[in-house]
A protein has these predicted regions:
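A short glycine-rich, His/Asp/Glu-containing loop-to-beta-strand
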Residues: 1-30, 36
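Double-stranded beta-helix
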Residues: 11-19, 75-102
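Short, surface-exposed charged micro-motifs
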Residues: 17, 39, 63, 73
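Hydrophobic residues in beta-strands and at strand termini
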Residues: 20-22, 42, 66, 76
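Short beta-strand His + acidic residue motifs that chelate non-heme Fe in jelly-roll/DSBH
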Residues: 28-29, 49-50, 66, 72-78
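Short, conserved beta-strand element in jelly-roll/cupin
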Residues: 32-49
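Short acidic-glycine-tyrosine-enriched beta hairpin
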Residues: 52-69
Length: 102
């Protein structure tokens, strides 16, 4: 079973942590807008990313980069695989940081 946990408070950067409980779990085919950068960090386990004319495998510690408007899908190749997807829009505002007094 695939679980998704959105990352919060990242300004113009959006992200989601995906946990694949079992080998064979799939994050369905999707694509990202033309004005975005999309990277995936393989946090643990092993993953296969693929599209109509390519496929790539990634293991824990690897970063995968995707072109805009390129449909792709992910499949876990090991139980308990985790990926972190980060999407940043071009031309977005930088994050607003507020100092915290401790």
């Amino acid at each position: 079973m695939l679980l998704a946990n959105p990352l919060k408070n990242l300004g113009d950067i959006n992200g989601t942590i995906y946990d694949f409980g079992k080998m064979g779990d799939i994050l369905p085919k999707h694509n990202h807008e033309e004005n975005t950068v999309h990277i995936t960090i393989v946090a643990r386990g092993k993953i296969k990313a693929y599209s109509h004319d390519w496929e790539v495998e990634g293991i824990a510690g690897q970063i995968l980069d995707f072109r805009p408007n390129e449909p792709h899908e992910f499949m876990a190749l090991e139980d308990n695989t985790r990926i972190i997807n980060i999407v940043k829009k071009f031309g977005g505002q930088s994050n607003d940081y507020q100092q915290v007094n401790t």
